[in-house]
Curated annotation (Swiss-Prot):
GO molecular function, one term: 2-hydroxyglutarate dehydrogenase activity
InterPro entries from the UniProt entry: FAD/NAD-bd_sf (IPR036188), MQO (IPR006231)
Top class in the EC scheme: oxidoreductase
EC number of the protein: 1.1.5.4
Lineage: Bacteria, Pseudomonadati, Pseudomonadota, Betaproteobacteria, Neisseriales
Family: Belongs to the MQO family.
Alphabetical list of HAMAP family matching this protein: MQO (MF_00212)
Signal peptide extent: none
Pathway: Carbohydrate metabolism; tricarboxylic acid cycle; oxaloacetate from (S)-malate (quinone route): step 1/1
Obligatory cofactor(s): FAD
Protein name: Probable malate:quinone oxidoreductase
Cross-referenced Pfam families: Mqo
GN (gene name): mqo
Gene Ontology biological-process annotations: tricarboxylic acid cycle
Length: 488
């Protein structure tokens, strides 16, 4: 006998938690069930040590505004990401102010910096600063080539550095470090208090659609396959991180045809020595290597996890065929079907530099990896650093009318035409833009309900529908309000 519920959220990460809270705020009478394959929420990509914890607001990430072939830097993408992060930030602040989250401990003020180390990159960074400085959301950004000034911002990155090496840096005091695991747990605790059912250790075996339009999920307990649970719902969200592609394929919706995935693993060096960690308070992003994917941009970060400060450096990209950190090595081969084989082959052929890069990363020894860290922290002591494995990221491969198949970085919502099912594919900037992503998903899947949501959405996100970059006075009010509530 199937258990009926209005909404099923598959996956216990930041995306399902965000969508769950939004729906509970906008449709409090709807019954919601969240199911997770592991024993608790936020154990995969949302876990603090499975991501970099950067509040992605385009303050330091150079790949969001590259130098164009015409020599021009276009800030449009960076501004879009910054606007989205401020939507998330407003939503979190409202939940804290209304007492729906325990506290604001999930977010900390950590300055964001960009650091470059050759003359060409220094010229680029100066040009980027000149462009960004004219934008409201980046107006407080600082730039310097003065070694003493950069050392004031982040002493460890300059100590022991070659005096003849050209260096330049951007600095933004408004940066943040976010523990998305803690945020997810607080959100889910709130949902549980509102009657949302949470089912853990539940693996989705099958997804089928009935003649009346309802979706039926057959699940088995991972500890005992005989403990079956069947759910029947009118709306299904597949937000299982890297596992969303497999679930989308199980659903059989036509909109999901032609999608494939490239799993990319990440390694980081972590330093938990308090004497070292207390000397660095910044997220310092550099330039990606030629041929490297955007998510492999090296950065030396302050991390605040469970009340303790750490340093983290990476990522070092690698390849495992798992779609989830605790997934199966068969995830990739089993995801290859007739409808996505050609797009995957075409995308693979078109991205040979990426393939070579990943192979090169796989061959690196620990010492070779540590040499990259020394570029950002010249006096780093190998004894203070441990190599940890972060979460899996599954980059999107999709059909393309001209190229046959393309590899796409970023996130994408794939939804059934009638809005009864939606999946979120892809990765960065991911969690930082969870709130605008889920609002967009809700409007796409429930267009008839959207008008009735406007009032409450404007309470949850005070700047909802407003481009802060184009409304300076409103931007000042909202940014000051969220900074006060979140203590950032």
């Amino acid at each position: 006998m199937a258990e009926a519920t209005d909404v099923v959220l598959v996956g216990g990460g930041i995306m399902s938690a965000t969508l769950g809270v939004l729906l509970k705020e906008l449709e409090p009478s709807w019954e919601i069930t969240l199911i997770e394959r592991l024993e608790d929420v936020a154990l995969e990509s949302s876990n603090a040590w499975n991501n970099a914890g950067t509040g992605h607001s385009a303050l330091c990430e150079l790949n969001y505004a590259p130098l164009g072939a015409d020599g021009v830097i276009n800030p449009a993408r960076a501004l879009n990401i910054a606007e989205q992060f401020h939507v998330s930030r407003q939503f979190w602040a409202t939940l804290v102010a209304e007492g729906k989250l325990e506290d604001n401990s999930f977010i900390n003020a950590v300055p964001h910096m960009s650091l470059v180390m050759n003359e060409d990159h220094c010229r680029y960074l100066q040009k980027r600063y000149d462009v960004f400085k004219t934008q409201k959301l980046f107006e407080n950004m600082e730039f310097s080539t003065d070694r003493n000034k950069i050392s004031d911002w982040a002493p460890l990155i300059m100590r022991g550095r070659d005096e003849n090496q050209p260096v330049a840096a951007n600095y933004s005091a408004e940066g943040t470090d976010v523990d998305f695991g803690r945020l997810t747990r607080q959100m889910v605790k709130y949902l549980q208090g509102k009657g949302v059912k949470t089912e853990f250790n539940r693996h989705v075996e099958d997804i089928k659609r009935e003649s009346d339009g309802a979706w039926v999920l057959k699940t088995a307990d991972t500890r005992n396959p005989d403990w079956q649970l069947t759910l029947r719902t009118r709306f299904l969200f597949l937000g299982a991180g890297g596992g969303a592609l497999t679930l989308l394929q199980k659903s059989g919706i036509p909109e999901g045809k032609g999608y494939g995935g490239l799993p990319v693993s990440g390694l980081f060096f972590r330093n938990s020595n308090p004497e070292t960690a207390e000397q660095h308070n910044a997220k310092v992003y550099g330039q990606a290597s030629v041929g490297a994917p955007p998510m492999s941009v090296p950065h030396l970060d302050t991390r605040n996890v469970d009340g303790k400060r750490h340093l983290m450096f990476g990522p070092y990209a690698g390849f495992r065929s798992n779609f989830l950190k605790q997934g199966s090595f068969m995830d990739l081969p089993l995801s290859i079907h007739m409808d996505n084989l050609y797009p995957m082959l075409r995308a693979g052929w078109a991205n040979m530099p990426l393939t070579k890069y990943l192979l090169g990363e796989l061959r690196k020894t620990k010492e070779e990896r540590f040499a990259s860290l020394l570029e950002y922290y010249p006096e780093a002591n190998p004894d203070d650093w441990e190599l940890i494995t972060a979460g899996q990221r599954v980059q999107i491969i999709k059909k393309d009318s001209e190229k046959g198949g393309v590899l796409q970085f970023g996130t994408e919502i794939v939804a059934h035409a009638d809005g009864s099912l939606a999946a979120l594919l892809g990765a960065s900037p991911g969690a930082s833009t969870a709130v605008p992503l889920m609002i967009r998903l809700m409007h796409q899947c429930f267009p008839e309900r959207a008008p009735s949501w406007e009032g409450r959405l404007k309470e949850l996100v005070p700047g909802y529908g407003i481009k802060l970059n184009e409304n300076p006075e409103r931007a000042d009010e909202i940014i000051a309000y969220t900074a006060k509530v979140l203590d950032i």
